[in-house]
Amino acid sequence: MKRITALALSLIMILCAACVLAEDAGKNEIGTLKVGEAFSIQSRMPEGYTYMPVTETELNMVGILSAGAGKPAVTVSIAYNEEYADTERFNDVDEAVVEEIRDSFREADEEVTFEDLETAYGTRLLKVSGDGFVDIYTIYKGYELEFVMTGDSFTDADVQMMVDFISDMDFVTVE
């Protein structure tokens, strides 16, 4: 009886490990950032997109999600900000700070509009829309993340694609 129980538990553990590995299958490493501890950033690419790194340092990275015809281009920017060193998620900053962030977008373009969104896991996102761009902004573990779509027009499906991409993103600690 003990052997059957041990065998059953072993089988369950193997199946659980396989499920975890299957969940990460298909995710591409986008880059590695390091402030204190290092993070490998991984995500599944949206359909039709590939990631091309432009610059990467220990504190920040910039890349482009390249797409086929008819899809908006996306610039990915992830940068460490000392001001948010103790901030786990954008949800954790108070509304005065959110308003300062909005003001910084208004400085570049007074006509921008804002909409609050959230990832599948409840992380707050700030959608900033202007002429020819949609910027999706958030904060995670002290990093400011921006995903800027550029093009002539954007559909709700384009915006949802970016929200899904951000929702799927993993910051995996590198040892």
What are these regions (language model features)?
Residues 1-8:
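Positively charged n-region of N-terminal signal peptides that target proteins for export
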Residues 8-16:
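Bacterial N-terminal signal peptides
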Residues 15-29:
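Sec-dependent signal peptide cleavage junction
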Residues 27-32, 57-63, 118-127:
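Short, hydrophobic/aromatic-rich segments at coil-to-beta transitions
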Residues 38-90:
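Secretory pathway targeting signatures of secreted, lumenal, and periplasmic proteins
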Residues 44-48, 69-71, 120-122, 138-146:
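Short, solvent-exposed coil/turn segments at beta-strand boundaries
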Residues 99-141:
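Signature of long, low-cysteine stretches enriched in small and polar/charged residues
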Residues 123-175:
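Short, well-structured beta-strand
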